Amino acid sequence: MAYSDFTLSDLEEKFGVTNQRKALNFQSKAIEPTQWLKKELLDSKEMPIKSEKARSEWIVVPILKELRNLNVKFFTIYSGDNLVGDKEKGLQGECDFILSKDTKSYDISVPIFHIVEAKRNDLEEGIRQCSAQLVGAKKYNEKKGIKMDKLFGCTTTGDVWQFIEFSDQLYIDNNKYYLSEVDNLLGVFQSIIDYYKSTLK
């Protein structure tokens, strides 16, 4: 079993993790993208983005690089890495993107955010997979003696982004954010990063 095999019902039955849809209401302020990011995203519109790989290269990675530079490399980015949360229970598998607190480690140190590219542009499938990865990330951190009250993730088609908060249960955001309003998207990411800056020392 792998992260992509889990349903939300599986997470509740196997781990007692329930889920709820609600507006997460991020206390965020829009962030004007740099000229570099504007050009990257403008260039992406001219490309035939037909696959998850193309989407990550032309859309997701530039946004993550922008955020990393804005935050003086507070986090590092792992792409396509395997994260084992609980092998016996199937919480394992390749992750599209993991943001981890930057400790200069070659391995994933403290996973704090997961991004799942929605296969076949199916956000619901992405929500399920991302939710399983967040449960796995919590198990991974606990094995290292790291307790975190909240973890965040999102799934994206490139054009549409939907966020998840994992605390006492999974909270799936009713709101969606759009690449066409990238300043608002950057603001949501920044509010999450600011939360981690205040809780991770």
Where are these regions (language model features)?
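Charged, often low-complexity linker/regulatory segments
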Residues: 1-65, 198-201
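A short glycine/serine-rich beta->alpha loop
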Residues: 43-49, 83-86, 117-122
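Short terminal or interdomain "cap/linker" segment that borders an active site or interface and mediates
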Residues: 155-201
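Nucleic-acid nuclease catalytic cores
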Residues: 121-172
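Short, solvent-exposed loop/turn segments that connect beta-strands within catalytic domains
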Residues: 104-110, 144-148
